[in-house]
Amino acid sequence: MIKIRLTFSNDKKGLIEFAEALDNIKRTFNVLSVSKVYKGRGESKFSNVYIDVENK
């Protein structure tokens, strides 16, 4: 199992980039789980999502 952390900006462009990255990951790996979105601390403009994958 491999754990991937995706960090992306909290704006429309960042959400689009996140969705595209997740689609690419799904094409390459078997996705076991995707966490909820974790907002950055304080005034951070970024969020994180954790993805558990395994090789196809």
Residue ranges and their predicted role:
Residues 34-56:
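Short, intrinsically disordered low-complexity segments
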